[in-house]
Amino acid sequence: MEATLEQHLEDTMKNPSIVGVLCTDSQGLNLGCRGTLSDEHAGVISVLAQQAAKLTSDPTDIPVVCLESDNGNIMIQKHDGITVAVHKMAS
């Protein structure tokens, strides 16, 4: 699984508008990261996804957290116990 995750991280970073990607488990443990997103961000990203999920009563509704700034967006979503964050530069 680790090799597959590493390949997905590398493939994601091939997109020129993406400058960072991070995967974390539900405990905030960094499973892998590239670019602008690092180990220090894993806990916060995991908690943001968990807190956003509490805002909906529909368990099948999986929210996307989007942090916007002038320099770009960080999109965060949880998938089957793994939270993925992607840092995309503004176009």
Swiss-Prot record:
Its main location: other. Coiled coil: none annotated. Highly expressed in skeletal and cardiac muscle, followed by pancreas, kidney, liver, brain, placenta and lung. Elevated levels in both cancerous and non-cancerous liver tissue of patients with chronic HBV infection compared with hepatic tissue without HBV infection. It is found in: Lysosome; Cytoplasm, Cytosol. Pfam families: LAMTOR5. One of its GO terms (cellular component) is protein-containing complex. The modification N-acetylmethionine is found at residue 1. One of its GO terms (biological process) is protein localization to lysosome. Gene3D superfamilies: Dynein light chain 2a, cytoplasmic. Keywords: Acetylation, Cytoplasm, Lysosome. Belongs to the LAMTOR5 family. Homodimer. Part of the Ragulator complex composed of LAMTOR1, LAMTOR2, LAMTOR3, LAMTOR4 and LAMTOR5. LAMTOR4 and LAMTOR5 form a heterodimer that interacts, through LAMTOR1, with a LAMTOR2, LAMTOR3 heterodimer. The Ragulator complex interacts with both the mTORC1 complex and heterodimers constituted of the Rag GTPases RagA/RRAGA, RagB/RRAGB, RagC/RRAGC and RagD/RRAGD; regulated by amino acid availability. The Ragulator complex interacts with SLC38A9; the probable amino acid sensor. As part of the Ragulator complex it is involved in amino acid sensing and activation of mTORC1, a signaling complex promoting cell growth in response to growth factors, energy levels, and amino acids. Activated by amino acids through a mechanism involving the lysosomal V-ATPase, the Ragulator plays a dual role for the small GTPases Rag (RagA/RRAGA, RagB/RRAGB, RagC/RRAGC and/or RagD/RRAGD): it (1) acts as a guanine nucleotide exchange factor (GEF), activating the small GTPases Rag and (2) mediates recruitment of Rag GTPases to the lysosome membrane. This is Ragulator complex protein LAMTOR5. It comes from Homo sapiens (Human). The gene is LAMTOR5.
